[in-house]
Amino acid sequence: STVSSETSSTVASGESAASGSYTGTPIKVGGIGPITGAAATYGNAVKNAEELAVKEINAANGSDVFDWKFEDDEHDAEKSVNAYNSLKDWGMQVLAGPVTTTPTLAVAAESVNDNMFVMTPSASAQTVIETGDNVFQICFTDPNQGVASADYIAENALATKIGVIYDSSDAYSSGIYAKFKTEIGRASCRE
């Protein structure tokens, strides 16, 4: 199931360019993420942040700079591509998402053909930005998190023996673990 949220779709008019207000047709921004299912916590956080940002920017401008629509992908790559295509049909010009890595990789592969600007706020696999020149990543990558964790433990002498519990079937968890395992060897810790 696809859940959509949309701001009003009015064309701003009557404002002069000298006033500093945007007076053109609103820019259509799409969002994709899991707002239902196991990863809904992440998707809802991003959805709420995007919605708030659009409302605040439009309010500060006095007219609609952005139209925004968000689609639920349930953290599923195929549903994310379907959501992407639905947003393209809506007229999306910029994609703020997807939220999680696996759906982002699937959508990024599609977006290259369309030269759609894609900016994920939270998909953290290092391979996300390798899909095309149109795909950007705002957050830290999985390897960055593994390095930071290992550095923190080593710098603060927190342990000499470490056990790691991670989900080998999850790209996010595995990515952090792989880099952590490599980096923790610099310390006197044993995994």
Q: Which residues does each PLM region occupy?
A:
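Short, low-complexity disordered leader/linker segments with a strong preference
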Residues: S1-K28, A59-A60
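Extracytoplasmic "Venus flytrap"
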Residues: G14-T23, G30-A49, E71-A77, T100, ...
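Acidic-residue sensor for enzyme active/binding pockets
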Residues: E15, E56, E191
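Beta-alpha junction/loop-to-helix N-cap segments that form part of ligand/metal-binding clefts
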Residues: A17, T41-V46, A60-T127, I138
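Loop/turn elements at helix/coil->beta-strand transitions in domains of secreted/extracellular proteins
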Residues: T25-K28, G62-D67, W90-L95, N113-V118, ...
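An alpha-beta-alpha
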Residues: I35, V135-R190
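Solvent-exposed, polar/charged alpha-helical surfaces in well-ordered, non-transmembrane soluble domains
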Residues: N44, N48-K55, E78-D89, Q93, ...
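Signal peptide-proximal N-terminal region
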Residues: K47-W68, T182, R186-S188
